[in-house]
UniProtKB/Swiss-Prot annotation:
GO biological process, one term: terpenoid biosynthetic process
Organism of origin: Macrophomina phaseolina (strain MS6)
Disulfide bonds: none
Protein name in UniProt: Short chain dehydrogenase/reductase dpmpG
GO molecular function: oxidoreductase activity, acting on the CH-OH group of donors, NAD or NADP as acceptor; quinone binding
């Protein structure tokens, strides 16, 4: 969102959840949503970066901020986060699936199985878990409404594992 588009967008009363929200694009999106008046929840696995982002984002815009340490690949942690968000803000109107990790770009014959499992869990299962929970909340609203944004990288064009997850995420969203 550019500064001019956020000035024209009023998201007062809306709640946005951004996974991987403590750094880079996630933090920038959180700031933009806050400036547009939305309440914003960010989650990240990196506790130190989460504290820094929380300090930087607090007081940005008219919305409130909730920062939580959570592993997007853990369904129980995801449910606890949604419970906290709905207890504080009542709903989730926008979900941004931004959390992702990269592999080491190893050829398939050399891929470490534990790394494979972790990349699939964070980059593909995580957005599925969060989208499922967000849809349940969105559909319970008096007027069902909401938006889910899935962030993917250009790695989908390469032969890397993270790129394959981006392709899988794009296909999940079509169903």
């Amino acid at each position: 969102m550019s500064a001019s588009s956020t000035e024209a967008t009023n998201l007062a009363g809306k709640t946005c959840l951004i996974t991987g929200g403590a750094g880079g694009l996630g933090r920038a999106l959180a700031a933009a949503f806050l400036r547009a008046g939305a309440n914003v929840a960010i989650c990240d696995l990196n506790e130190e970066r989460l504290k820094q982002a929380s300090a930087e984002l607090s007081g940005t815009g008219a919305g409130s901020l909730l920062a939580a340490n959570a592993d997007v690949a853990d369904p129980a942690a995801a449910q606890q986060l949604f419970d906290r968000i709905t207890a504080k803000f009542r709903t989730v109107d926008v979900l941004v699936n931004n959390a992702a990790i990269m592999d080491r770009f190893d050829p398939v014959a050399d891929l470490d199985h534990e790394l494979w499992d972790r990349v699939i869990s964070v980059n593909l299962a995580g957005p599925f878990i969060f989208s499922k929970l967000a849809l349940r909340v969105m559909l319970q609203q008096p007027k069902p409404d909401g938006c889910i944004l899935n962030i993917a990288s250009g790695a989908a064009k390469g032969g890397w594992l993270a790129g394959r997850c981006d392709l899988g995420l794009a296909r999940i969203c079509r169903g």
